[in-house]
Structure formats: C-alpha cells, structure tokens
Amino acid sequence: MKSVLGFKKAKANREKISMVTCYDYTLAKIINSTDIDCILVGDSGGMVLLGKKNTTYTTLDDMQFMTQAVANGATDKFIVADLPFMSYRQSLEITMQAVTTLIQSGAHAIKLEGSSGNLDIIKHIVNSGVPVMGHIGMTPQFINSFGGFKVQGRTEEAAKHLLEEAKLLEQAGCFGIVLECIPANIAKDITQNLDIPTIGIGAGSNTDGQILVLQDMLGMNTDFQPKFVKKYIDGSKLFSDAINTYVKETKANTFPTKEHCYDYC
C-alpha cells in the first residue's frame, strides 16, 4: 500500500488490510521486504522499545526518534505515526507543531485517540493536507480514566456510543479507524456502517483489517500475552537460544572459526 488511497480501495474491494507496529530501523527493513500493507509507529513503542509504564509517558521526542528510524528502514511502506499523549489537547498550535514533526520525520499520516474534543482538530489537520486515522474503544492514552486496560463497549449504551463516535470520526475526515478491544459483534456493526475501513485489534475478524504489535505476534514479550494476540513464533526462545549458543561457543573457543577470521588470524 503506497498511499492513503489504498485504504479506500481495499474497503471497496473487500480486501483485508494488514498492519503491524514498528519502532526501529532494523525491524522496519525486514517489514519492508514483506507483504504487509501498512506500518504504525505506535506510542506503544514507549513501552515496548523504551520500557515505559504506559503510553502516557511516551513523548513527542520519542515518537520523532522512532518515526525517523522506521521511515529510514521501510522506504516502500505507508507509515502512520501516533500523536502522543497531550500533544493534541493543549492548543491547535501545539497540535500542528506535533503533526509537522511526525510528517517531517517520515510519516505519511497520523493517528489520534478518541472523538470527543478532537473533531475540529481532525478537520483542521485533514484540511492542512495530512491524513488522519482515528482510534476508539480501548484507547491506551485514557488508561487512567478507564482504570486499566479494559474491554470497552460491553453494554448497549456503550456500544451505541462507539458507533456514534465512529460516524463522527468519518464525518470529520478520518481515512480509517482503529477499533481496539471491543466485542466482535459491535466491531462488525461499526464496520458495516462506515465507508472508511476499520482496523481491529482485539475486535474480532469482521473488521476491514487487523493490526498487532510486532513484538507480541513474534512472541518476544513473555510477560504480556493478551487474549487477542496470536504468537506466530516463539521469538523470546529463539533469541535466547541463539544468544546462549553464542555464549557456549565463545567459552568453548569454537567461535570464531577460520571462516569468520581475516587472513591474519
């Protein structure tokens, strides 16, 4: 997927959209060689890459650093970058400075969380020439309001509110919406009532696409295994085994061998 137009085309053709998160150059280069449609430089990188407590601690400087790294590695992919916590809630000027920073760092679009209080901001960003992706449901930047990472939309009233939010985001100009940790039937209803694609994470299989944190799907984080994540490999074990093999060979002096040495060895 080369541009935001690919999202609209995929929705029209009923083609599923695949997305993963990425935060660094090395993994971005690998992803660039795959069939993945889109990369999200998520504020989750503050947790996954930098070890921060939650995404409210991720800064614009963090996002700039990660976006530049990913853009340098994934030169053929469409890149969306998260606006970090409070970067779009202080003033329009501060918001647009943050948007400019991420776009000039290599992002092709930005994502922000929630609808209430954001609609005029989204319209302004879109009218400024920057595509915007919405995000509703379990929005991690609102963790303190939610009282933790909890599934949203489990009551009739909450489900109705999510649909209303999605429609408002579409009307404001969003080209797509992430639906996070909501019941599958609610995600299906939202998807069927929008002309823009929905990207699910913990939202069932009836969304227009899926997104996962790369390190989660690669099994690199043994301490975080939510229900909605499928581990495609046991990355933690693969890496640990490789490192331990290197340690053993070093101590046994079986590495390096002649093939790893220059002529003077």
Curated annotation (Swiss-Prot):
The active site is at E180 (proton acceptor). Pfam families: Pantoate_transf (PF02548). Its cofactor is Mg(2+). The keyword Magnesium applies. It is found in: Cytoplasm. SUPFAM superfamilies: Phosphoenolpyruvate/pyruvate domain. The keyword Secreted does not apply. Homodecamer; pentamer of dimers. Belongs to the PanB family. This is 3-methyl-2-oxobutanoate hydroxymethyltransferase. The lineage of its organism: Bacteria, Pseudomonadati, Pseudomonadota, Gammaproteobacteria, Thiotrichales. The gene is panB.
